[in-house]
Amino acid sequence: RIADYRLSPAEDKVLFRLDGKPLYRRSAYSSYVVYDTELGEAAPLHESDSLRYAVFSPDGERVAFVLRNNIYVKELATGRETAVTTDGVPNHIINGMPDWVYEEEWGLEDALRWSPDGEKLAFLRFDESGVRDYSLDLYGPDGSTPEDDVTAPRYPRRFTYKYPMAGEANSAVSLHVYDLASGRTTHVDVGPERDQYLPFFGWTPAGALCFYRINRLQNHLEVFVDDLKGTRKMIYEERSDKYIDNIGMGTVTFLSDGD
């Protein structure tokens, strides 16, 4: 059953996400299918049914997707796949997808952005190794049997995930840019502070990278634009003696000339 779909920019392809296994409030493990509207043909994006996210490149010729906490790029014409990251490990390193905090509290559904020219990928990397585990007992069907099946599990199952209590360590989050032509990944300088949030990032029309930085107390917000050539400029700053509301955060719009 189709859960969601995305059209390519030229609307000649459709990326279908099929029903999968829920993870958190907004995320799931799913299968994806690419449908070519001109040929009338459909093909799986990947053989796995555990993809976390997939998105067309700006020209519609590639798809970036996240599988097992790593990012891949697939050329649709040839089927060739390139690994953007290789260090992803469950409950340790997440690439291209938010951890629980960023999904639940900041509303991020993904952590991966194509550049306007389709030649670069910006992504967040979450190091959860310092975050303590939290476990819940889950009752009811686990998805392996129909809900009305008498053989469905009657005992609770244990679900364990990384959950930082108040005052405990959050994930260490870093921002990176992958260049498809060179295959090189660049670490973006977001400042020396470890205990902070990067709740929004994206590209300007001119190809510079914009990102928000806010401290853990959430009362000091800074917005930067980095041209990825050595120049970073703060374009907005806000302070509060209480806290800064995150409603509407990330709804920045750049003019077409990028200025």
Task: Give the location of each predicted region.
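Beta-propeller folds
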Residues: R1-D259
